[in-house]
Regions:
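Intrinsically disordered, serine/threonine/proline
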Residues: 1-158, 352-409
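C-terminal cap/substrate-recognition subdomain and adjoining C-terminal extension
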Residues: 2-20, 228-409
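Alpha-helical substrate-recognition element adjacent to the catalytic core
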Residues: 6-43, 47, 53-56, 96, ...
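Intrinsically disordered, low-complexity acidic/polar segments
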Residues: 73, 132, 164, 324-326
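Short, low-complexity, polar/charged sequence segments that are solvent-exposed and flexible
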Residues: 82-85, 123, 132-134, 160, ...
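Short, well-ordered amphipathic alpha-helices
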Residues: 125, 206-210, 301-304
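Short helix-terminating capping/connector loops at secondary-structure junctions
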Residues: 132-135, 160-161, 215-220, 282-284, ...
Length: 409
């Protein structure tokens, strides 16, 4: 029997009515805002958010967004809760610019693109016969059609130096998000920044080891998928850099309101869609899929195992609450049973060390990396959970009378 999580749903007619109402309101608000901005000169493009792209010897796939607001810049060491809250507001109050003509260049080839209604651009650049750089990353460039706002766009090179690829979730897979504790999750999202958010211990060393492969010299690409909105892209990219997690293309979700992507629609199916696209785009590679038990990753990755078979090397589902048996564990274990007949190993794991030990047995990483991962995981086991740490921090501020930096760490 197919495992199903317990979930309450709104009646279909109520959901449809709410969607239509909010979509209509959103369209009117967007239209009014753009008329106001055009009247007072506030709709001019000021920033091209060029997301990390990926490609191979034949070309590259690139995406990004044109905004009428300047970039926020990285987090500062002295940012307090108010700075973080204000920056979060600025991220979600995005002033996208539709209908902007762009010129994108890569390996000497130039193409034109135009932003859509939400300010996004997407382009495929074919570069047959053009030399491919030996580096793991190569830069494309994107600019307005008149040449202004010239912006570099990093392109991950998937070349002969890769044995396999990694597709990983983000929340509670590499980044502590406490997605099951809404109070802590809200505090982390709104009152923290890329510098104060915490990685899962051992994740950075594990992902670097997977990228380097069994011999320690490979260039295996790492991709990230998440149900978080594109508005958080800069925070996630900064977070990876600050915590030495291998950078890679990040595929997020547009929370714009239309029938295809209504903000309140449940589900994480776009993760599977992105995984399918990557697997098809790079047919030479086999894949390692990493997720967590807090969302639907087990179900989605099980579908990938059934669909792609031997092209999936392994599936690892992090237990968001290891040591405690709960319905989520049974849900994940049910999908593991479903996958058992595919010959794809699928495991529910407690931490990065469990992933590393199994991956070592498959010949996916070098044994020398285990000691570093084990040491980081051991430190994490002695640390309080995020809800416990948040409660302790709040108590300390009450005792000391220091409430000027709530949420900071």
């Amino acid at each position: 029997m197919t495992p199903t999580p317990s979930r309450r749903r709104w009646p279909a007619h109520v959901t449809k009515y709410l969607q239509e109402f909010v979509i209509d309101a959103d369209e009117h608000l967007d239209s009014a805002r753009r008329r106001y901005a055009a009247r007072f000169g506030g709709d001019a493009p000021k920033h091209i958010a060029a997301y990390r792209a990926h490609g191979d010897a034949g070309g590259a796939d690139l995406s990004g967004r044109v905004l009428a607001s300047a970039p926020l810049g990285g987090p500062k060491e002295d940012d307090g809760w108010w700075d973080n809250l204000l920056n979060t507001y600025r991220r979600f109050e995005s002033d996208e610019v539709p209908g902007v003509a762009l010129e994108i260049a890569f390996r000497g080839v130039r193409v034109r693109a135009t932003t859509d209604a939400e300010g996004y651009y997407h382009a495929r650049i074919d570069t047959p016969g053009a030399p491919m750089s030996d580096a793991l990353w190569e830069n494309a460039s994107v600019a307005l059609a008149d040449g202004t706002l010239l912006t570099p766009q990093p392109v991950l090179q998937v070349g002969d130096g890769a044995d396999f690829g990694v597709i990983s979730d983000i929340d509670d897979t590499i980044l502590h998000s406490s997605i099951l504790d809404w109070k802590t999750a809200a505090q982390l999202t709104f009152l923290h920044n890329a510098r104060t958010r915490k990685p899962l211990r051992g994740a950075a060393t594990l992902y670097r080891a997977l990228q380097a492969g069994a011999g320690g010299t490979r260039r295996n690409p790492v991709f990230y998928v998440s149900s978080s909105p594109w508005n958080l892209y800069d925070l996630l990219d900064d977070f990876m850099e600050l915590n030495a997690i291998p950078p890679g293309p990040v595929f997020l979700r547009d929370i714009g309101m239309d029938p295809g992507k209504f903000v309140k629609t449940a589900g994480h199916g776009h993760k599977l869609d992105r995984a399918r696209e990557l697997i098809a785009r790079h047919p030479r590679l086999r894949w390692v899929l990493v997720g967590d038990s807090g969302q639907a990753d087990a179900e989605l990755y099980a579908a990938a195992a059934r669909e792609f078979g031997e092209r999936i090397l392994a599936i690892y589902i992090r237990d968001v609450d290891p040591g405690t048996e709960d319905p989520r564990d049974a849900f994940v274990d049910g999908w593991i049973e479903q996958v058992a007949g595919t010959a794809v190993p699928m495991l529910r794991v407690a931490d990065s060390l469990a992933i590393a030990e199994h991956a070592l047995g498959l010949g996916l990483l070098d044994a020398a990396s285990l000691d570093g991962i084990a040491a980081e995981v051991q430190r994490a086991r002695a640390r309080p959970t995020l809800p416990e740490a948040a409660a302790d921090e709040a108590k300390e501020k009450v005792v000391t009378g220091d409430v000027s930096q709530p949420g900071a760490s």
